[in-house]
Amino acid sequence: MKKYILPLVLVAALTGCESIYLPTLKEVPVYPTNRTQAEEGHSGSYHLASRHWTDVSKIRDEATRLSYEVSQGKLTKVQAAQYLNRYRIQLVGRNAVDDSVYEVYLRSAVDSQRGAISTEQSKLYIQNTLKGWQQRWPNMQSKPTNPAFTNFLMEVMGMEPLK
């Protein structure tokens, strides 16, 4: 339980600031970098990448570090969200699921930071997005092998991860 406290603090911290900052979303997922074996022409059932849960743990550790920076006033919540996104792209690459979830995560942080939504509304916004991916996941044709950012947030929110 203790390992979830700091990521939960990060989620809360990223959603409760009231300064105004509106970043532009410049990154567009054109070519996902971690595709499934089926996409690459291999047969067999779907499996997450062997390093997936290690990557989820690394993202959690980075989120914890960024949460501390936000609590010290060194970063805004939106800046922390952007740093976390750069970290996850560097760590696991891009994929449609993580890119989509990050877009909602950033929008939620921006809206919360400028006072348009509450921390609770921000959390619900992210949870609804995650629930949507849980519903789509079983029927997806091209599942990414390493949706680490999405599963990190699933873990933080106490939801069943994508498998």
Where are the regions a protein language model picked out?
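Short, solvent-exposed mixed-charge patches
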Residues: 160-163
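Intrinsically disordered, low-complexity segments enriched in glycine/proline and serine/threonine
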Residues: 5-9, 30, 82, 124
